[in-house]
């Protein structure tokens, strides 16, 4: 890790007992990495609806949950790279059936095939990689994301939804599965709950569609913060302003739950129509402009907690 987050003292985050981050993809992995200094006080609830890439091929041929985002989060919060972590992230090249597959995905799928609970499979890998933070799938049952289009037709599959040319009317889960019990327990015990950054429709929203998650969020007294993206999404969600996305969450949950949001300095929506705190900060990483700098992000969260 190139930043100094694990050596920095945080006035507010150091006092927080439990933080839960909800999402998927690279966004959640980046956030978990930024907060990895919190170790066992940090929990990620990860979207498991992916049907693209190596994960999609495994699901198509062998069924099961989507392991890719879980694997990515595990890999991003490793503070001490090792042969084991390199092996876990190894991706096959060349020709043939293994080409493009990630070894970590295959390892996790193998554990699933051995009838080991996904939560236990992740725990085994956490121990192998010396990861202290907790990571739970949104559900331990196979599930896909679906959408109702403006025409009234429906499509199933995260990849298809990301490739839509218009915003869907609504999204839903197929089938409507049960949430992972440990994820619900983490939400119930959380002092801070973070949403994003990441793809809004396909990474952030899926866990919030689970009835048990909705109930936990409705009852939670935790501070709830939405972290905005640094660049426009390459998906139908690009047509949604920050206010639109927060209101979509509120509509899904059935309650206005977001207390604050963190936005980059180039943000064009400061949510003036919503009753929440907005923190504007430079957040871009030096190497990749659309990725959050870990140190800047963790400091922004810490400062915002001091104002809530």
From Swiss-Prot:
* Signal peptide positions on this chain: none
Coarse class of the protein's main subcellular location: cytoplasm
Spell out the family assignment given in the record's similarity comment: Belongs to the gluconeogenesis factor family.
| Database matches in InterPro entries | CofD (IPR002882), CofD-like_dom_sf (IPR038136), Gluconeogen_factor (IPR010119)
Identify the PANTHER family for this entry. Answer: GLUCONEOGENESIS FACTOR-RELATED (PTHR30135:SF3), UNCHARACTERIZED PROTEIN YVCK-RELATED (PTHR30135)
**Gene Ontology MF term list:** LPPG:FO 2-phospho-L-lactate transferase activity
Q: Where does the UniProt annotation locate this protein?
A: Cytoplasm
- Where would one find coiled-coil regions in this protein? none
Would you say which domain of life the source belongs to? Answer: Bacteria
Task: Kindly provide the name given to this protein in its UniProt entry.
Answer: Putative gluconeogenesis factor
Keyword terms: Cytoplasm
Function of the protein: Required for morphogenesis under gluconeogenic growth conditions.
HAMAP family, sorted: Gluconeogen_factor
Task: Give the GO cellular component terms, alphabetically.
Answer: cytoplasm
One biological process term from GO is:
regulation of cell shape
